Amino acid sequence: MSQGVTAPFARHAMAYVLAGGRGSRLMELTDWRAKPAVYFGGKSRIIDFALSNALNSGIRRIAVATQYKAHSLIRHLQRGWNFFRPERNESFDILPASQRVSEEMWYRGTADAVFQNIDIIESYDPKFIVLLAGDHVYKMDYEKMLQQHVEQGADVTVGCLEVPRAEATAFGVMHTDTTDRIISFLEKPADPPAMPGKADKSLVSMGIYVFETKFLLDELRRDAADPNSSHDFGKDIIPYIVKHGKAVAHHFDKSCRRSSSEAVSYWRDVGTVDAYWAANIDLTDIVPELDLYDREWPIWTYGEITPPAKFVHDKEGRRGEAVSSLVSGGCIISGASLRHSLLFTGVRVHSFSHVENTVVLPYADIGRSCRLKNVVIDAEVKLPAGLVVGEDPELDAKRFRRTENGICLITRAMIEKLDA
């Protein structure tokens, strides 16, 4: 056990969230916002899950490193995460890329995004750093990961989970021994190695790391001085520690926050339009795998002040109704029907429209007599009356972004082209 440090270890830790990525596979959803700032689940942004996990785990010092088109993200953090109090030894720092090392360099990689802020980390003097990706959806108790890190005397502890081999090319893939020590680590291999005894599975990194702060800062300084390094945790830092130190795997099953003992371990990289749509629509299930109603592990976010959702008209063929759907505050469903859909704040759906399997981001407006199926509608989009999407694949592909799985993404620019 670390000298002078007692449980709970989270009170001695700083959470450092990497939130600078674009997430280009989300296509036009990230044209004007970073991936961590993309809306999710009716009220939240994707980054709220990592931040809420840190807060619920007992961590009271948090820093968020931003870079790509950060305005939307920074505004959200300032509005929704401004309740930390220095007089209670709490802190919440937003760290935009600001050429702190030289005038020529922004953040050159994930490791450099921490290295350039070493002075800020040292000013708080945390015993541990919990390094997090800000673009995944999951619920996890980081205290349990910290406990394993201390008990096993690791130099780094890496959060991991099993995924199908076909999906593992997008992750760091590891092999472990019987004590969970990592003996090999490959970043995004073209042919991911399988787990022993599980030919169709690979053990992959979740992008969650625990370090003792002094060890991490020493490694970052070593890496920064290496002209051959890409200054990335997955490509450089972790493989180096696996070879020269002690890297340990922490299995997500051990710390996943579940709604019941029978529930599955839920983690999603909502990095494509298909995955994003599916993860949101999953929430309309009777018992979704991701429990947003757990009052003991809430997902904190900016709570915009809105009136309740409203459903009006009760005539045959013009009835405001929703079945198996999530409808946020400020929405008005005026003589329209929703099925298996998720509406964010302030959405308006006009009479005679039918919306199914659709995700509608804040303040979108769906005109009269629209028929929508398997759609993602970006924020503040105004759909014209009579628009039909999800019935003619060829026409959809000409007008909108249509994925391989048949999901259509609609943005304001696409609607403006229809009117041109």
From Swiss-Prot:
It catalyses: alpha-D-glucose 1-phosphate + ATP + H(+) = ADP-alpha-D-glucose + diphosphate. Pfam families: Hexapep_GlmU, NTP_transferase. Its EC number is 2.7.7.27. PROSITE patterns: ADP_GLC_PYROPHOSPH_1 (PS00808), ADP_GLC_PYROPHOSPH_2 (PS00809), ADP_GLC_PYROPHOSPH_3 (PS00810). It comes from the Bacteria. Keywords: ATP-binding, Carbohydrate metabolism, Glycogen biosynthesis, Glycogen metabolism, Nucleotide-binding, Nucleotidyltransferase, Transferase. Pathway: Glycan biosynthesis; glycogen biosynthesis. SUPFAM superfamilies: Nucleotide-diphospho-sugar transferases, Trimeric LpxA-like enzymes. Alpha-D-glucose 1-phosphate binds at Y107, G172, E187, K188, S205. GO terms for biological process: glycogen biosynthetic process. GO terms for molecular function: ATP binding; glucose-1-phosphate adenylyltransferase activity. Involved in the biosynthesis of ADP-glucose, a building block required for the elongation reactions to produce glycogen. Catalyzes the reaction between ATP and alpha-D-glucose 1-phosphate (G1P) to produce pyrophosphate and ADP-Glc. Belongs to the bacterial/plant glucose-1-phosphate adenylyltransferase family. HAMAP family: GlgC. Homotetramer. This is Glucose-1-phosphate adenylyltransferase. It comes from Rhodopseudomonas palustris (strain TIE-1). The gene is glgC.
